[in-house]
Amino acid sequence: MTAFKYKIYLTLLYCLMISQVQAQPQLNLPATTLTILSYVRWNTPNPISLCILNNSQLSNQFIQVNQQLKSAYQIQAVSLSELNKVMCNAVFFSTYTPREEQNIINNLKDAPLTFSSNNTECELGSAFCLYQNKTRTSFKVNLASLSQSQVRVDPRVLLLAKSTEP
C-alpha cells in the first residue's frame, strides 16, 4: 500500500470513529474522561481505579468505552457509603451539586482526581468538569481542586481546557 493510500485509509478510519462518537453522544463523557486520565502521571502503580459514584448506568457506559479503547482502567460503580472503603484513584460525580461534591471530597481519606458532569461553573468541587457543548464534550479545570489530588496532569490538557471554555 502506498503512503498516499495509507493516509487516505487512516483519514477514513478516523472519520468513521468520529461519526460513531457523534452518533452516541452519551459515550462522549466516558471517552473524554478516559482520555484525560491517560495524560495523568500517577503516584501509584497500575492499574488505576476509576469509581463512578451512585450511577450504575453511567458506570456501564464507562466500562463499554474502556473496553473499546482497550484501556487498562478498573471501572467500578460505588455508592457514597462505600467510597472510603474502596480504592479509587479517580472519582466521577454525576448526581451531586458542586457543594455536595466539595463536601464529599473534603471527607475522603485519600485525595483522588475528581470529575463531574453536573458542575458547569467548576469553581467548587471536582477538578475536571465535563459538559456537553452543542455536539461535543468540553471541560473546565478547577486548579484548586486539581492541586489537592496530588497527581500531575500534562499541561497541554490544562491548555486545552482553557481554550474550550464557553
Protein language model annotation of sequence segments:
Residues 2-5, 22-166:
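Short hydrophobic alpha-helices and adjacent helix-cap/hinge residues
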